[in-house]
């Protein structure tokens, strides 16, 4: 049993965070949202996760992004957040946007991944049990399935909404034309596509080649993940590979990505950030929000201090033309789209 609720949310939490419309929908999301991918699993101290989430809400972050297999181990991030929803956040459910996803491997056998109706809807039921919720706000197809008809996967999202288990439907890492097709199918079913969640950073700009145009045309929101290129766009690797970092732990960022060319680009970007009076990470996050078609950017955090540093991006969101031109000299594709298998479908 959890102890009594002792958390008192900051009464000024909505005064510091800008909220942006999700496409043409009625839903507003904070400019910065919190992703619970690698830092909220069962391998992390619960009190650390608790402190980060509480501080996020105090800073005006109302959107918390999950997936069925976030951890490690799989499912444990949803369980951690479910504990918080049952205690500290219990009075605030209607002030929160909780999202989860299904698409990657979750359990053994042929029904434990991809985009079949059987897997997608079973996964959502499991997620709701772990979260202790009757519904999530946004339910995503986590990746494109090359072998399952798109009509089946989108039909499962529509069913989730019609059953009241999700309020909105989303997709993640879908190519531009497949996004257009998915939106058309959902429109035909009467459940509009709310949002797309692609990877997007200064070193991973694939969405600028057609996807943002499609989303703008369709009135679909966009929330970018991995905006700091798995930590490359921070000061973390300026002096080598620190213990406990993603590279050191072999988590999603291969050591061969930290090339001399990448280090030189990071150094150039850091100089521009210094000229703006911002840390590199803050500038990199602000840069992902420079396009009005971007609804929000997803940050991760392993500590309260790291979260607070990321939110400093809001101190200066504007860029001059000269700054953007200077950034473009260094912000070039760096072959770090680890999710291209889906976006190439």
Regions inferred by a protein language model and the residue ranges of each:
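Active-site groove signature of glycoside hydrolases
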Residues: 128-148
